[in-house]
UniProtKB/Swiss-Prot annotation:
One Pfam entry name: Proton_antipo_M
Any GO MF annotation of the entry: quinone binding
Gene Ontology BP terms: ATP synthesis coupled electron transport
Protein name: NADH-quinone oxidoreductase subunit N
Top EC class for this record: translocase
Lineage per the UniProt record: Bacteria, Pseudomonadati, Pseudomonadota, Alphaproteobacteria, Hyphomicrobiales
EC number, UniProt record: 7.1.1.-
Length: 476
């Protein structure tokens, strides 16, 4: 069903987020800094409401604005996951903003605007909508990275992200212009009809477009910004960076590859396979020497994007199902891990080295138990959620005949398990360090839910797997 103006229900989540951003700016402008907590609460409510509206949308494909915006089961699944990541990262930031004297109403507004960009990006049906959504998301993220103006690290993180982000946006735009030049259309469905053979110009366009998207998912070789920005940005901001924007970028990566370029699969499959192998290898080996837990999680996220891309490299419906399942489980594991990093405070000051977790099992046994479950899950140890996610992407690769890619993925998982297990060893077997400060209630709730989800997901995986399968079918 295609039309110039889509039914109101199809764009209601985006309209709600846009309206919320305007209202929140007005509240902040009228009430000043004292409105920060109110604006934060309303922003969380807006993100949750947008997620509920997405879930209430009918399970049909709607193409609005002459195909520029697609609302289908795939977009709905990824929007729910991304909005969940955005809402939870805002919940995690409430206590930090007050403790760090960073209670600025602009923070929540920027997260809402970034979430609007994320929703537009996930629903993009042509290259122009893709670029507009990407820039709305990116411009908000550049400011959020440097939100703590009193911190040199935060300012440096924002500047690095801005400079490299601008470069990647330029590459993406150049790739999009090449694809348009060689196909005569920007619409994904139109590109699919015209791009039936891998001409040189088209392949160059795909390379540049994918390079820009690789930057957004922090895949090798466009990962350089990730460790520095993750370490330098405030922890709640890092939690947001590591979840919602990556879900959006991975969604558009999958949509462009599968929907716009189905007849040149072999060309983009080689690119995705190389990026996947390089990301898994770097994520596994570079994290081994890390002492800062945020840098460790940064390299870990690079590796996990490599694992997710294994499913896309397969180029099949099963592969895309694996990608969707992987991203959903990755978001929960990552939010839980960064909750623990946020809770690492002594005498009101944040500590970030792995050694600071020494003996945590004796000083904070429940926090240690939850973090151990998350680390085992990130390592892909059965029967935890992380294992289920890896199983599905590797199975898709094997079914598609990519045996080498699956073997490299398993080896990278084994190597990567070392640094996750080292964290568990330090928590349970080293002499206790000084105890951390008490954990705020909202962090306890996030940690409990993420820990329980990763531990007991294997008992009832069917609903999420079925939802991911239905979403993947919409693209084929």
């Amino acid at each position: 069903m295609s039309s110039l103006l889509p039914p109101l229900g199809a764009v209601l989540p985006e309209l709600l987020l846009a309206l919320s951003a305007v209202v929140l700016v007005l509240i902040g402008a009228i009430q000043g800094e004292k409105s920060a907590n109110l604006v934060n609460g309303l922003a969380i409510a807006a993100l949750v409401a947008a997620g509920v509206l997405v879930m209430l949308q009918p399970a049909v494909t709607i193409a609005g604005f002459n195909g520029s915006m697609l609302v289908d089961p795939f977009a709905r699944f990824m929007k729910v996951v991304a909005l969940l990541g955005a809402a939870v990262s805002l919940i995690m930031s409430v206590d930090w903003l007050n403790r760090a004297q960073q209670a600025k109403f602009e923070y929540a507004v920027l997260v809402v605007l970034a979430s609007l960009g994320i929703c537009i990006l996930i629903s993009a049906g042509d290259l122009i909508a893709l670029y507009l959504g990407l820039e709305l998301m990116s411009l908000s993220l550049y400011v959020v990275a440097a939100i703590n103006r009193d911190s040199v690290r935060s300012t440096e993180a924002g500047l690095k992200y801005f400079v490299l982000g601008a470069l990647s946006s330029g590459m993406l735009l150049y790739g999009a212009s090449l694809i348009y030049g060689f196909t005569g259309t920007v619409n994904f469905a139109g590109i699919a009809k015209v791009a039936t053979a891998p001409t040189t110009g088209l392949v160059f366009g795909i390379v540049f477009l994918f390079a820009g998207l690789c930057f957004k998912v922090s895949a090798v070789p466009f990962h350089m910004w990730t460790p520095d920005v993750y370490e330098g940005a405030p922890t709640p901001v890092t939690a947001f960076f590591a979840t919602a924007p990556k879900v959006a970028a991975m969604a558009v990566f999958v949509r462009v590859a599968v929907e716009a370029l189905p007849h040149v699969t072999h060309s983009w499959q080689q690119i995705v396979t190389f990026v996947s192998i390089a990301s898994m290898a770097l994520g596994a080996f570079a994290a081994i020497g890390q002492r800062n837990i945020k840098r460790l999680l940064a390299y870990s996220s690079i590796g996990h994007m490599g694992f997710a891309l294994v499913g896309l490299a397969a180029g099949t419906e099963q592969g895309v199902t694996g990608v969707l399942l992987y991203m959903a489980i990755y978001v929960v594991m990552t939010l839980g891990s960064f909750t623990c990093v946020l809770a690492m405070r002594r005498d009101g000051r944040s500590v970030e080295t792995i050694e600071d977790l020494a003996g945590l099992a004796r000083t904070k046994p429940l926090m240690a138990l939850a973090l151990a479950a998350l680390m085992f899950s990130l390592a892909g140890i059965p029967p935890l959620a992380g294992f289920v996610a890896k199983y599905y992407v590797f199975l898709a690769a094997i079914q598609a005949g990519l045996y080498g890619l699956a073997v490299i993925g398993v080896v990278a998982s084994v190597v990567g398990a070392y640094y996750y297990l080292r964290v568990v060893k330090i928590m349970y077997f080293d002499e206790p360090a000084e105890a951390f400060d008490g954990m705020p209630g909202e962090l306890k709730a996030v940690l409990a839910v993420s820990g329980l989800f990763t531990t007991f997901f294997f008992l009832a995986p069917t609903p999420l797997i079925a939802a991911a399968g239905a979403a993947a079918r919409a693209l084929f």
